[in-house]
Amino acid sequence: MTIQHTQDLAQIRAMVPEMRRVKSIHFIGIGGAGMSGIAEVLLNEGYQITGSDLSENPVTERLVSKGATVFIGHQASNVEKASVVVVSTAINEENPEVMAARELRIPIVRRAEMLAELMRFRHGIAVAGTHGKTTTTALVTQIYSEAGLDPTFVNGGLVKSAGTNARLGSSRILIAEADESDASFLHLQPMVSIVTNIEADHMDTYGGDFETLKQTFIDFLHNLPFYGQAIVCIDDPVIRELIPRISRQVITYGFSEDADVRIEDYHQEGQQGKFTVVREGRANLDITLNIPGRHNALNASAAIAVATEDDISDEAILKAMAGTQGTGRRFDHLGEFDTGNGHAMLVDDYGHHPTEVDVTIHAARSGWQDKRLVMIFQPHRYSRTRDLYDDFANVLEQVDVLIMLDVYAAGEKPIAGADGRALCRTIRSRGKVDPIFVPEIEQLPSVLANVIQDGDLILTQGAGDVGKVAKQLAALELNISKMLG
């Protein structure tokens, strides 16, 4: 399916004159990856953007540099001049800005509703799934950019080649990460939808019922028009089970023999994955992917499937795969350093679900077989730790050295027996690895200094503030004397 992408922004804006009545858009929680991306696109479209967050970060600083007004802290006065208020899933009804907006009768919309407005008159490509959304979104973006199509994109993480997680393009293409955590991706009405995989996560949203989660993904795909396309990973057993229930054109990808876009002969050489992509009716592609892991080969094949259906040249696909710099905090190689006791490599990864942690460990083992793997793991949310406790224990015992931080609560209250200390006890009892529990994150550099050896691969893992620790360790160059203070 070849799509005409030449419609310009002036034409898109002319289609929605009512939206131009909106003068000021306020984002509560503007510093988050998903919120900031939409804010940046709207800012570049000419809207007055304000927002609030609990603290400054590089994202808020970037928005301010582009003309946004960002308040630190949440207070009622921040929304007084807003035409509409956008809220993230982390914002509750007791937030003073939400309460003030209701009092002032200012419309309140969720992040996905605003993303849906951006997508309404564009050729939308939405990327959903439990794992791999951010990297897949970045790879689709990279291909379309390499093809000269200048897409708008809104991603849940930094697209390193672009230096941002969102950008307003000049074409009518919009590539967006679609968030299933609160089922708000049902607001989106794209032309193409990718589903990478489906696992039990964010189950509180779905009443603890996996069947409800599966049906929600089907409903998401049925938001496609009848001429739209569902690009799905047939390697995933849940997706394979659901395919007969999808009443849209389905294109499959994966390592499976019956995949429409099939991966063959995968092997990893350090940071790069190399494999062949087989497509019916098209030439095979010998891919060099500049990010490691079989899971990233799957993400790449999803992007290749979309591009193939849109008749994008093989040359653009190959250049995008070889040239990708990946995404922030996804097997993010922060450097190799002289520690004072030899050399060590530092990698930072956002994965916080057992499946994500497992594929990251396998990528590290495959690319650097001679290195001792030292993982600094921070569990994310007490509820996830409780629900996936045994899975976490099974995965984490694969590393050589495990340094465990306590749970990053993300607003949740503690749950007895579902914390870092309990996980350490369980893993230690199995006898494969003796975890080191670090109750205060500030203690981590000195603890690591007493563990690190020549040739180590240090992997910081998790969705909380362990990413800040990774940057701190990089700034200290993993130097033992500096880490000891």
From Swiss-Prot:
Belongs to the MurCDEF family. Pathway: Cell wall biogenesis; peptidoglycan biosynthesis. It is found in: Cytoplasm. Gene3D superfamilies: Mur ligase, C-terminal domain, Mur-like, catalytic domain, NAD(P)-binding Rossmann-like Domain. Keywords: ATP-binding, Cell cycle, Cell division, Cell shape, Cell wall biogenesis/degradation, Cytoplasm, Ligase, Nucleotide-binding, Peptidoglycan synthesis. GO terms for molecular function: ATP binding; UDP-N-acetylmuramate-L-alanine ligase activity. This is UDP-N-acetylmuramate--L-alanine ligase. Its EC number is 6.3.2.8. ATP binds at G129, T130, H131, G132, K133, T134, T135. Cell wall formation. It catalyses: UDP-N-acetyl-alpha-D-muramate + L-alanine + ATP = UDP-N-acetyl-alpha-D-muramoyl-L-alanine + ADP + phosphate + H(+). InterPro entries: Mur-like_cat_sf, Mur_ligase_C, Mur_ligase_C_dom_sf, Mur_ligase_cen, Mur_ligase_N, MurCDEF_pg_biosynth, UDP-N-AcMur_Ala_ligase_MurC. GO terms for biological process: cell division; cell wall organization; peptidoglycan biosynthetic process; regulation of cell shape. The gene is murC. PANTHER family: UDP-N-ACETYLMURAMATE--L-ALANINE LIGASE, UDP-N-ACETYLMURAMATE--L-ALANINE LIGASE-RELATED. One of its GO terms (cellular component) is cytoplasm.
